[in-house]
Amino acid sequence: MESLTLQPIARVDGTINLPGSKSVSNRALLLAALAHGKTVLTNLLDSDDVRHMLNALTALGVSYTLSADRTRCEIIGNGGPLHAESARELFLGNAGTAMRPLAAALCLGSNDIVLTGEPRMKERPIGHLVDALRQGGAKITYLEQENYPPLRLQGGFTGGNVDVDGSVSSQFLTALLMTAPLAPEDTVIRIKGDLVSKPYIDITLNLMKTFGVEIENQHYQQFVVKGGQSYQSPGTYLVEGDASSASYFLAAAAIRGGTVKVTGIGRNSMQGDIRFADVLEKMGATICWGDDYISCTRGELNAIDMDMNHIPDAAMTIATAALFAKGTTTLRNIYNWRVKETDRLFAMATELRKVGAEVEEGHDFIRITPPEKLKFAEIATYNDHRMAMCFSLVALSDTPVTILDPKCTAKTFPDYFEQLARISQPG
């Protein structure tokens, strides 16, 4: 297996221009494909997940052109639901941001299409979304294991009253919200259980509004969506930088700054993961906010005990930053780590112990006490981009670290290690 050994980093300093947000890129691509008119997306993320969405749109007859660096995309909207001319299978890798929204959108009208992906995708639950779509008339068949992809979709979603469980993934609600305006009837979506990752719903609502559709949000408990609507292209749309990707550089500065400035997001960003910077501030770093940047300057870091449900992806970065904080850090309400690219609670606990930390792994929390001195280890990454990026922070000590399968960062950030090297000074 390929590996990358990072030598100790004495200091980080500099500016990082963030790649486009994965969450925003894939939502914008789908809405542009469903909309009337031509949409030009700029600062689009070029990564595996986005390529899976683009390949699916091609198979569905959507025409688009990409710039040479794949960050500018001109899409000719379909002016309504997408149709596969003949029955076909779409392979979506391990891209939840493609699988969930497409599973809903392809239930409009009369399709016959199979959605499948990598082995890990077949372990990521989708039952709550399927249950909700079926309530609205969709005809969906599980082809292997009940409640998991691959799925056969045969259209039929017309709207109506739909209950959806929000306790596992906000992407199920996102998928329903984006699909419902194109259904023939009105849809009333009721949330069962606690809605996780609420800020990701705000991204969805914000983008839908950009494409001309507003819905009634009743305190995130119920959403009323008028049927028979259509999306309209906004013309040009700039994709924000990826706030989850920003977390690694901001944390690096908190640990070994200097100062690191990330551009492409700022105080008015629609991504909830910008709140990660508040957590670093609480730990003792200095944060400065601009309209188009966030900067972080080193501080003496102290442990925290916090509910991280609002920033589940960026919270992983706090787990490795905790290795550099004084005291025991507890991250709570993070059960949904278990249904991501890998079981991230298990993976994080296992790898933190390798570098010498004392770790308690609970059903929905993790507690981390750093060692006096970090140990050299080979870090398994579980084909999870965030594991690779999180554990790069171990090199900010006087101990090197080896990352196995470093190219797994291609899911969201193909040149992550080059960017980290650019702002790093060796120990």
UniProtKB/Swiss-Prot annotation:
One of its GO terms (molecular function) is 3-phosphoshikimate 1-carboxyvinyltransferase activity. GO terms for cellular component: cytoplasm. The active site is at 313 (proton acceptor). Pathway: Metabolic intermediate biosynthesis; chorismate biosynthesis; chorismate from D-erythrose 4-phosphate and phosphoenolpyruvate: step 6/7. GO terms for biological process: amino acid biosynthetic process; aromatic amino acid family biosynthetic process; chorismate biosynthetic process. It is an enzyme of class 2 (transferase). It is found in: Cytoplasm. 3-phosphoshikimate binds at residues 22-23, 27, 169-171, 197, 313, 336, 340. Keywords: Amino-acid biosynthesis, Aromatic amino acid biosynthesis, Cytoplasm, Transferase. Its main location: cytoplasm. Transmembrane segments: none annotated. It catalyses: 3-phosphoshikimate + phosphoenolpyruvate = 5-O-(1-carboxyvinyl)-3-phosphoshikimate + phosphate. Gene3D superfamilies: Enolpyruvate transferase domain. The keyword Iron does not apply. It comes from the Bacteria. Phosphoenolpyruvate binds at residues 22, 96, 124, 171, 344, 386, 411. InterPro entries: Enolpyruvate_Tfrase_dom (IPR001986), Enolpyruvate_Tfrase_sf (IPR036968), EPSP_synthase (IPR006264), EPSP_synthase_CS (IPR023193), RNA3'P_cycl/enolpyr_Trfase_a/b (IPR013792). Its EC number is 2.5.1.19. Monomer. Belongs to the EPSP synthase family. Catalyzes the transfer of the enolpyruvyl moiety of phosphoenolpyruvate (PEP) to the 5-hydroxyl of shikimate-3-phosphate (S3P) to produce enolpyruvyl shikimate-3-phosphate and inorganic phosphate. HAMAP family: EPSP_synth (MF_00210). This is 3-phosphoshikimate 1-carboxyvinyltransferase. It comes from Escherichia coli O1:K1 / APEC.
